[in-house]
């Protein structure tokens, strides 16, 4: 984990201010992570440029913020929630890259700019999503957390990732016989990673 040390926001009187401070912590750490991709070598530059392109595209960062706040509620050290925040956002970003591909939703735009496959090509985008899925677990493994905490985090992360993928499978099939079935699909696609962020942060 990075040598950078963070502290919880001092004032909890205004939600928007706390949210912004959590986001600022996350964005600073994410910049460090994306910079570290350069260490993987020039021959993988296209892969990690695409991964960084999507990771740094913005978004609300609800999942990292949730990990930080659950850590605070549980009385933890925010620095121990950083691996959870980064890993969950990597998985979320991988899912968005794949979701935008022509074989899925075929979306040309994501967060106000060309989607990953439009900017970097379909093959590289597919591999960038795969790389982020793998890197999420690696990031936790490489952290300074105790071994048992790493194991618990990784299990939670990939259990929930599988649930998210199963939800996307239902969406791809496009057959919803009942409202409950439709809601179940949305629940799996969205709530699985929100749950992961909450559990991993605590």
Describe the residue ranges of each PLM region:
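N-terminal amphipathic/basic leader segments beginning at the initiator methionine
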Residues: 1-34
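Short, N-terminal intrinsically disordered low-complexity segments that are rich in Pro/Gly
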Residues: 12-20, 36-41, 55-56, 126
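Mg2+-dependent prenyl diphosphate-binding active-site environment of isoprenoid biosynthetic enzymes
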Residues: 25, 31, 41-202
């Amino acid at each position: 984990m990075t040598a950078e040390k963070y502290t919880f926001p001092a004032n909890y009187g205004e939600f928007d201010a706390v949210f912004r401070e959590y986001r600022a912590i996350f964005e600073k750490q994410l910049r460090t992570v994306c910079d570290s991709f350069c260490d993987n070598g020039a021959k993988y530059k296209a892969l990690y440029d695409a991964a960084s392109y999507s990771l740094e595209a913005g978004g609300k960062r609800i999942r990292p913020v949730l990990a930080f706040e659950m850590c605070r509620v549980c009385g933890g050290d925010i620095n121990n929630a950083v691996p959870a925040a980064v890993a969950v956002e990597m998985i979320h970003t991988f899912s968005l890259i794949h979701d935008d591909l022509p074989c899925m939703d075929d979306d040309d735009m994501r967060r106000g700019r060309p989607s990953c496959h439009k900017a970097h090509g379909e093959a590289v985008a597919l591999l960038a999503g795969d790389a982020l899925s793998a890197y999420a677990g690696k990031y936790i493994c490489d952290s300074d957390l105790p071994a048992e905490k790493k194991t618990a985090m990784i299990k939670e992360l990939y259990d929930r990732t599988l649930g998210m993928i199963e939800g996307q499978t239902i969406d791809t099939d496009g057959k919803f016989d009942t409202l409950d079935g439709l809601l179940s699909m949305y629940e799996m696609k969205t709530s699985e990673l929100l749950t992961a962020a909450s559990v991993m942060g605590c």
